[in-house]
Amino acid sequence: MSQNEIKSYELEKHTTKDIHDSHINGSLIPIWRDWDKIITVQPEMVYVTTINPGEIKGPHLHIIRHSYYVCIKGRVVFIIKDESGKYIEIESSEEKPVLIEIPKNRSSAHINLSNEPSIILALVNPSWKPDNRDEHDVTYD
């Protein structure tokens, strides 16, 4: 597969259990494992970003940054413009986690569909730097 393709991967979600009485005490979601071979561009930075309820981040374009995103709290729709100009909508949430790969030179907007702040885990290459943000604002029709 090309590093220029927009891709998404449904992630596994496993319940975790208490050691004393086996009640469910949480969950575990593998984002990446070495044998999955879904991360084709090695991340140089991992960070957490938030989106307030009903808010939109973007749309903006990263010219040099290749990004992977997964919503780990709340519910977010990612709207990505592909190379033909078509809009692709991919939803990721804490209930149904989806890892979304957005190559450089593809614009995207991230919309919080939740009533509370949503939290997104981001894996990017190259690293974000305050003096070289690589965020170029664009507009969607």
For each predicted feature, which ranges?
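Asparagine-centered strand-capping/turn motif at beta-strand->loop junctions
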Residues: 110-113
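Non-catalytic, conserved peripheral segments adjacent to functional cores
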Residues: 1-99, 115-141
